[in-house]
């Protein structure tokens, strides 16, 4: 008969093996979409957008019609052409692909459609951030991350409002017009959606609203 100590060690060994198996499954769940991601074309929005519209609509190469719009909550008589640090913008979208996460942030407009928008003011959310955002919670930040995958929500991603319509809501607090990454008082910038790190080179969800900053 096995001694109590041996039974304990055997039980700990089984527990360790189970935990290792779970860790491998979770890691595969996270890494597989990144490894299998491939470019899916353009969002259909041209780089040159006239004026400072509060909404844009474009049909991507994937056949989805996406709409992006913004409401400046304290706009008074201003619009997106005269932003100041601390402005709060409620950003909404529809028609997005809910199987791929997106970042929402103020980023430099790229020189070509096949280039990634950025750098972005304040950077983009990182996977080192902890905390599931409660459904319906309003938390303003320089950038938001929207991803329905439960694993990424553990790192602070928001969920889509409606997967069927590809609808989301993000809450952006405008940072200073310049940081160590980009100076939006000198460069063309926009309030962007773009695919998150699970599909970084896929440009099909790159939509933006041009922004400017008050002098």
Q: What residue ranges belong to the model's regions?
A:
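Extracytoplasmic/secretory-pathway segments with low complexity and glycosylation-like composition
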Residues: 2-215
